[in-house]
Amino acid sequence: MSVSFENKETNRGVLTFTISQDQIKPELDRVFKSVKKSLNVPGFRKGHLPRPIFDKKFGEESLYQDVMNALLPNAYEAAVKEAGLEVVAQPKIDVTSMEKGQDWVIAAEVVTKPEVKLGDYKNLEVSVDVEKEVTDADVEERIERERNNLAELVIKEAAAENGDTVVIDFVGSIDGVEFDGGKGENFSLGLGSGQFIPGFEDQLVGHSAGETVDVIVTFPEDYQAEDLAGKEAKFVTTIHEVKAKEVPALDDELAKDIDEEVETLADLKEKYRKELAAAKEEAYKDAVEGAAIDTAVENAEIVELPEEMIHEEVHRSVNEFLGNLQRQGINPDMYFQITGTTQEDLHNQYQAEAESRTKTNLVIEAVAKAEGFDASEEEIQKEVEQLAADYNMEVAQVQNLLSADMLKHDITIKKAVELITSTATVK
């Protein structure tokens, strides 16, 4: 294989390489054997057409595209490796020569990984705004949240207050004309929950069961239903019931209802204190890691970040987001309709995040390279076993999904992150 690379501009160039006749000839034979099985040529049994007759009738060149499709991926990968390039986007392929009996010549326009000039990344001083200490208020807030989850709604005679739930019928109209989606019966609405249009819930506060209230609101300018956006509407609202939240007493019985593993309220408080301490410690470590990596990225200089890298990261993020929606049973088209957005809006939303993540990945990879980090066979095996345990998969499944190079890359990245983080100190 002949390989050459010509720089055209920063992070861009043309990789020219050949596919030899030693590779082409056996692949031509293989493709011919496959093609002739379906050929019906008068005078010959199906699948038994001799090669010379095929070449005369159809031309050897008719096989070239299939041969190229089969050989190109591996040939391109080998050329990239031989040229010592780190390519970061799909190439633009131009087949410059496919002469019969000659080596084929391919020119690929490629985008290469940008140069990263590292600044300080060890022994950094960082600031974090995360408290590690667990206070009594933290414990009480957790218990109060669980206590409220066990609360019951009890009908009350008094007027509705914020925090109460009202059961209502409502009919909405604009200029006296009812509109689609503006009617409901026996609807349970938490006052102060923000479920309805701003101002709706506030106008029910102070009213009692049996009352009918004319609620006047204006739809927001950015309301998802464009025909209603910015318009004033009247909702004739009848209150059937007003319910107040009744929370259980704060005692040992409550503690046992919240967590069957404890006997007393004191036990529950102690358990929550330990859990909160562990969670805060983890949050603190994450904050230190994030601050240290952000500082290392700020200290580095990346020579012209290619747009293609950002686009690929945006594409990956959007696909991940839409995939998560579908796993929740939400069709992407439905999501765009409900939110009044488009796929282009979603791409724009991820643009800044993708640029930041791409820079971060490049700097961490540069640190791993500068430190000469590698991964042993033992470390790779341990990583495979850990992933299998994390995702409840067989070890063989993980090995089939992830190549050794991918696993090695992940391990060296973890080592770089650990180095940056472990040597950092908090101001």
Swiss-Prot record:
The keyword Cell cycle applies. It is an enzyme of class 5 (isomerase). Residues 163-248 form the PPIase FKBP-type domain. One of its GO terms (cellular component) is cytoplasm. Its main location: cytoplasm. It is found in: Cytoplasm. Keywords: Cell cycle, Cell division, Chaperone, Cytoplasm, Isomerase, Rotamase. InterPro entries: PPIase_dom_sf (IPR046357), PPIase_FKBP_dom (IPR001179), Trig_fac (IPR005215), Trigger_fac_C (IPR008880), Trigger_fac_C_sf (IPR037041), Trigger_fac_ribosome-bd_bac (IPR008881), Trigger_fac_ribosome-bd_sf (IPR036611), Trigger_fact/SurA_dom_sf (IPR027304). The keyword Phosphoprotein does not apply. One of its GO terms (molecular function) is peptidyl-prolyl cis-trans isomerase activity. Consists of 3 domains; the N-terminus binds the ribosome, the middle domain has PPIase activity, while the C-terminus has intrinsic chaperone activity on its own. Involved in protein export. Acts as a chaperone by maintaining the newly synthesized protein in an open conformation. Functions as a peptidyl-prolyl cis-trans isomerase. Belongs to the FKBP-type PPIase family. Tig subfamily. This is Trigger factor. It comes from Streptococcus pneumoniae (strain CGSP14). The lineage of its organism: Bacteria, Bacillati, Bacillota, Bacilli, Lactobacillales.
